[in-house]
Amino acid sequence: MLRDGQGKLLTQTRHIIDNDSTQVKLLPFNFIKRGSDNSRSINPVLMLSPNERIYGCGESFTSLNKVGQKVQISVVDPQGPETDGMYKPVPFYFSNRGYGIFMHTSAPTTADFGASYIGAQRLFMGDETMDFFIFFGEPKDVLNAYTDVTGKSPMLPLWTFGTWMSRITYFSQEEGLDIARKLRANKIPPDVIHFDTGWFGVDWQCDYEFAKDRFKDPVAMLKSMKKDGFHTCLWQLPYFTPKNRYFRELVDGGMAVHNGNGTLSYEDA
């Protein structure tokens, strides 16, 4: 059981005797064992209280309150904000009841916050051991304690918290400058113009150079945007095909990511 300093019950592990439905049998806090290879993974099951709200687990575009959701805490390309996948998952969450949990694992985890059973939060972890940090207090205290463990980021410049103007994608110097002019003319106050994949010579294939046929003078463009009060962000992708001029340097220098069997990791190269 987790209780606060005044003895209030915050949450507790669920056991087989806690089943409160005659029809639906919820597995208690357990290990899941696979017959194929005898491996195990842990499945912590905790109480989820009425009106409890859960926040965290990283960047996602679903509802801020995760109760009622099944959150996949693993890196995927969500292909847009309409899905529940995450570029930046974080195995940490906190509750409005005054506690937070950091799952100290890099293994894929599925957090079922009352999605399949409203009275339980179920953590399906791809790990044989459970290493949890549990924090107590108001949200600001929980976050402060969590970052005491994982590290605190420095305060970013004020402009980074402003509006970033982007799309997939601005393909030319003139298009970027035109967007900047229209934003100022219409008194829309963004701080950043972001060029997605379209600034490369070949879309999606990052060679860290502006396409010469579409960006005639990128230095002048950057100076113009800076004069108008814009910061410029350039999208980058650490993905190199054999035709990329940096490919051989990457492979020969031992900088490429390899699969477990030693072969190069690739998609459609």
What are these regions (language model features)?
Residues 1-160, 167-169, 173-174, 180-185:
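Catalytic and substrate-binding clefts that recognize carbohydrates or anionic sugar/phosphate headgroups
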Residues 48, 154-269:
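Aromatic-lined carbohydrate-binding/catalytic grooves of carbohydrate-active enzymes
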